[in-house]
């Protein structure tokens, strides 16, 4: 990621005007409540607006980071030396009469809220997602899942803004730079989904999720709401409250990250104001005043301890971003 000092500030200010903000604190926008400031910050209000912003940033070869719910992201204490695009594209539209029934949502829409809206309409299929705090876009990129459900099991099609090649920049007649990119509709097969990953996650920076259509099934509001409450109740009993990023590590094949961390004797371990939860060892809690560095030190301590005891290298489920 380029340094903020290399960003073309005059061009960015001219292009985005008063929409472009500088030195914006990011901690309040993340579920862990840690991290520094965004050097530059702009809010996308719709999928078309998001596409337009990204078009400009790609065309100018400007580094950027898209932030949605901030629930799976650890922002460094020194902040993000790039343009942070805050995704507030949140339109949602249900098709109850369709075959199958479905919901279309822009990528900044809250995934858990959509599951509850579906329940009110007697539409099932997303009950597993009711407790997920992230956005539709993040779910599409990371193949979000819970309670044996995954995004890949619901996705019908997603609209993707695709940058073909980083060397596709070319000069226009006016002298401006223009990138080779286009809007495409991807079926679920194209994403190469596996456990908590996709082609979009494996090749970062080349694709932006604009919207997605998800498969639903007809049921009754009572049945769907009952299933949601069952899942939510289970989450309350097994997952700690407080500021966290959710599951810190992916579960290794045939085992659970939380079990390994607990067996390594790290439940309740604290560094600064950050703690490995005594309730569920795969959750790292900010008790107020923790830094990203505190959490990162716990991550490294955990990885080292689990590898030493079990020979297993835990893979992060969250994404560290920014400067450290």
Where would I find each of the regions flagged by the language model?
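Structural signature of FAD isoalloxazine-binding scaffolds in flavoprotein oxidoreductases
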Residues: 36, 42-47, 74-92, 141-164, ...
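Phosphate/pyrophosphate- and phosphate-bearing ligand-binding catalytic cores of soluble enzymes
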Residues: 21-22, 28-30, 73, 161-165, ...
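Anion-binding (especially nucleotide phosphate/pyrophosphate-binding) glycine-rich loop
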Residues: 2-140, 144
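Short, well-ordered alpha-helical segments in soluble proteins
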Residues: 118, 136, 140-144, 159-162, ...
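Short, basic and Ser/Thr-rich N-terminal targeting/leader segments
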Residues: 60, 67-69, 154, 242-243, ...
């Amino acid at each position: 990621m380029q340094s903020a000092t290399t960003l073309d500030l005059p061009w960015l200010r001219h292009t985005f005007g008063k929409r472009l903000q500088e030195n914006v604190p990011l901690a309040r926008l993340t579920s862990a409540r840690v991290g520094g400031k965004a050097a530059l910050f702009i809010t996308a209000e719709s999928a078309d607006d998001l596409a337009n912003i990204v078009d400009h940033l790609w065309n100018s070869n400007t580094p950027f980071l898209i932030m949605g719910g901030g629930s799976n992201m650890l922002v460094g204490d020194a902040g993000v030396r790039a343009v942070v695009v805050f995704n507030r594209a949140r339109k949602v539209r249900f098709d109850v009469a369709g075959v199958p029934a479905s919901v279309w949502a822009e990528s900044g829409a809250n995934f858990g809220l959509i599951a509850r809206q579906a329940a009110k309409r007697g539409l099932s299929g997303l009950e597993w997602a009711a407790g997920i705090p992230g956005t539709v876009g993040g779910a599409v990129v990371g193949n979000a899942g819970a309670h044996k459900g995954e995004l890949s099991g619901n996705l019908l099609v997603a609209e993707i803004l695709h940058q073909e090649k980083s060397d596709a920049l070319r000069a226009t007649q006016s002298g401006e730079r223009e990138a080779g990119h286009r809007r495409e509709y991807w079926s679920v097969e194209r994403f190469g989904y596996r456990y908590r990953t996709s082609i979009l996650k494996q090749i970062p920076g080349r694709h932006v999720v604009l919207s997605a259509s998800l498969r639903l099934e007809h049921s009754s509001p009572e049945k769907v709401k009952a299933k949601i409450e069952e899942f939510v109740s289970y989450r309350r009993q097994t997952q700690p409250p407080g500021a966290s990023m959710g599951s810190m590590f992916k579960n290794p094949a045939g085992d659970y990250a939380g079990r390994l961390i607990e067996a390594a004797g790290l439940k309740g371990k604290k560094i600064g104001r950050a703690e490995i939860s005594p309730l569920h060892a795969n959750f790292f809690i900010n008790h107020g005043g923790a830094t990203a560095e505190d959490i990162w030190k716990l991550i490294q301590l955990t990885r080292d301890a689990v590898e030493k005891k079990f020979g297993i290298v835990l893979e992060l489920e969250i994404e560290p971003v920014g400067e450290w």
